[in-house]
């Protein structure tokens, strides 16, 4: 019997948190993992840690530097994968930022206390909002565009966009944006851009306008709502690829200063499940809240 050909996965933001654990779980299942991160030192250390822990070979997991907000960096990774592996089976867009400044002491002191308003511990700036959109929305979009040709060479291609329940349309206060992003039939990338540009224009004029967009973390909410909308567009455009977004749950990570409820193992299990589902059993164009299909 012919040996099964290896399956290859890229995980962005793989040096820590949920991304690191996704890499661990995939490698443990025999998937060959390309762990990526902006920070080369941290990425290389993460790969060495996993090789020792899982007792796997140099071929089982490799590191490649990646900044999803930099087109040159994305192209460099695509060339690397094409040259060394010839195809891609799984793309997990996990890299992301919160887009806010957090008063960590106040957050830790208040977490779990009755009447605590965590939104009062954070501050949004235009610069952070812009970076958040670049990384959380345009980053995955750029990755998908670069890797679809390599995914099309797989017999079981899938894209998993790690999103958030905060990106559900119901969390938008702006009715105009809500209308555009919930209109599945007429969704286009241009319309998503219009929503994003309007948010950034509003924040550039006055950061207080954030309250017209979401109750809290407006750039983060819009970036994830945009990512969910793009997931639907991509699934329709490429029926041969299983494309889904997933909220891993409120996980203890560096992004929320370990105030989450779930462990990274629990959080990573949801994107990993979607990555490994048999092709014929895998839905496409869905938003998952952990392991359950939910509304966009």
Curated annotation (Swiss-Prot):
<dbReference type="GO" id="GO:0008106">
    <property type="term" value="F:alcohol dehydrogenase (NADP+) activity"/>
</dbReference>
<comment type="function">
    <text>Aldehyde reductase that catalyzes the reduction of the aldehyde carbonyl groups on saturated and alpha,beta-unsaturated aldehydes with more than 5 carbons.</text>
</comment>
<keyword id="KW-0521">NADP</keyword>
<keyword id="KW-0560">Oxidoreductase</keyword>
<dbReference type="Pfam" id="PF00106">
    <property type="entry name" value="adh_short"/>
</dbReference>
<dbReference type="GO" id="GO:0005829">
    <property type="term" value="C:cytosol"/>
</dbReference>
<feature type="active site" description="Proton acceptor">
    <location>
        <position position="220"/>
    </location>
</feature>
<dbReference type="InterPro" id="IPR036291">
    <property type="entry name" value="NAD(P)-bd_dom_sf"/>
</dbReference>
<dbReference type="InterPro" id="IPR002347">
    <property type="entry name" value="SDR_fam"/>
</dbReference>
<feature type="binding site">
    <location>
        <begin position="16"/>
        <end position="40"/>
    </location>
    <ligand>
        <name>NADP(+)</name>
    </ligand>
</feature>
<protein>
    <recommendedName>
        <fullName>Short-chain dehydrogenase/reductase 2b</fullName>
        <ecNumber>1.1.1.-</ecNumber>
    </recommendedName>
</protein>
<feature type="binding site">
    <location>
        <position position="164"/>
    </location>
    <ligand>
        <name>substrate</name>
    </ligand>
</feature>
<dbReference type="InterPro" id="IPR045313">
    <property type="entry name" value="CBR1-like"/>
</dbReference>
<comment type="similarity">
    <text>Belongs to the short-chain dehydrogenases/reductases (SDR) family.</text>
</comment>
<dbReference type="Pfam" id="PF13561">
    <property type="entry name" value="adh_short_C2"/>
</dbReference>
């Amino acid at each position: 019997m012919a040996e099964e050909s290896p399956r290859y996965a890229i995980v962005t933001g793989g040096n820590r948190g949920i991304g690191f654990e996704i890499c661990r779980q995939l490698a443990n299942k025999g998937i060959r993992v390309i762990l990526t991160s902006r920070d080369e030192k941290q990425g290389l250390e993460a790969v060495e840690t996993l090789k020792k822990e899982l007792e796997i070979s140099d071929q089982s997991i490799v590191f490649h530097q990646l900044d999803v907000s930099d087109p040159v960096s994305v192209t460099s990774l695509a060339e690397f994968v094409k040259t060394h592996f010839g195809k891609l089976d799984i793309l997990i867009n996990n890299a992301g930022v919160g887009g806010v400044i957090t008063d960590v002491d106040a957050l830790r002191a208040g977490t779990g206390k009755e009447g605590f308003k965590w939104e009062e511990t954070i501050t949004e700036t235009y610069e952070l909002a812009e970076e958040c959109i670049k990384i959380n929305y345009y980053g995955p979009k750029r990755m998908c565009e670069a890797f679809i040709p390599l995914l099309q060479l797989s017999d079981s291609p899938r894209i998993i966009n790690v999103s958030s329940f905060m990106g559900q349309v119901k969390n938008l206060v702006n009715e105009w944006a809500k209308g555009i992003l919930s209109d599945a039939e007429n969704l286009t990338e241009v319309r998503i851009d219009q929503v994003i540009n309007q948010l950034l224009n509003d924040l550039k004029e006055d950061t207080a306008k954030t309250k017209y967009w979401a109750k809290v973390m407006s750039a983060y909410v819009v970036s994830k709502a945009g990512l969910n909308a793009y997931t639907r567009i991509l699934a329709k455009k490429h029926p041969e690829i299983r494309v889904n977004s997933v909220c891993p749950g409120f996980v203890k990570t560096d992004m929320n200063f370990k105030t989450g409820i779930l462990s990274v193992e629990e959080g990573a299990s949801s994107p990993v499940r979607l990555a490994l589902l048999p092709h014929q059993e895998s839905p496409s164009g869905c938003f998952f809240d952990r392991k359950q299909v939910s509304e966009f």
